[in-house]
From Swiss-Prot:
Similarity comment: family membership: Belongs to the RnpA family.
Record text on subunit structure and interactions: Consists of a catalytic RNA component (M1 or rnpB) and a protein subunit.
Any one GO biological process: tRNA 5'-leader removal
Gene name of the encoded protein: rnpA
Origin superkingdom: Bacteria
EC number per UniProt: 3.1.26.5
Entry keyword set: Endonuclease, Hydrolase, Nuclease, RNA-binding, tRNA processing
Function statement: RNaseP catalyzes the removal of the 5'-leader sequence from pre-tRNA to produce the mature 5'-terminus. It can also cleave other RNA substrates such as 4.5S RNA. The protein component plays an auxiliary but essential role in vivo by binding to the 5'-leader sequence and broadening the substrate specificity of the ribozyme.
Gene Ontology terms, MF aspect: 3'-tRNA processing endoribonuclease activity; ribonuclease P activity; tRNA binding
Name of the molecule in the record: Ribonuclease P protein component
Matches recorded under Pfam families: Ribonuclease_P (PF00825)
Gene Ontology CC entries for this record: ribonuclease P complex
Species for this entry: Neisseria meningitidis serogroup C / serotype 2a (strain ATCC 700532 / DSM 15464 / FAM18)
Length: 121
């Protein structure tokens, strides 16, 4: 198992983010929203993160949320389809609610329609 999180697994350019948002394939829960593309032409998934200052004012809070999401992706990337994903944090979470954020991320990323995720056009 490869648990690294190298550059090839990240969305780095604005065009990469724009192409994912252009598909308008979004699902959201209480804390997170995940946009996904139909495919990226690669043999592995890639992820981009959006945590705005409106969500968390302090940089260390934003960094913690990104760290939790990156860690979940790093451990589960082998189970994901080769698509591009953009995860946007809607509401701030901390150590006490990180478990809920990980559970929501699993529901959103694996796209199980029985999980009650709200699909947005």
């Amino acid at each position: 198992m490869d648990y690294r999180f190298g550059r090839q697994y990240r969305l780095l350019k604005t065009d990469d983010f724009s192409s994912v948002f252009a598909f308008r394939n979004r699902r959201s829960r209480d804390l997170l929203q995940v946009s996904r593309s139909n495919g990226n032409g690669l043999d592995h998934p890639r992820i981009g993160l959006v945590v705005g200052k409106k969500t968390a004012k302090r940089a260390n809070e934003r960094n913690y949320m990104k760290r939790v999401i990156r860690d979940w992706f790093r451990l589960n990337k082998n189970r994901l389809p080769p698509q591009d994903f953009v995860v946007r944090v809607h509401r701030k979470f901390d150590r006490s609610t990180a478990k809920q954020a990980r559970a929501e991320l699993a529901q959103l990323m694996f796209g199980n329609p029985a999980t009650g995720c709200r699909k947005q056009a």
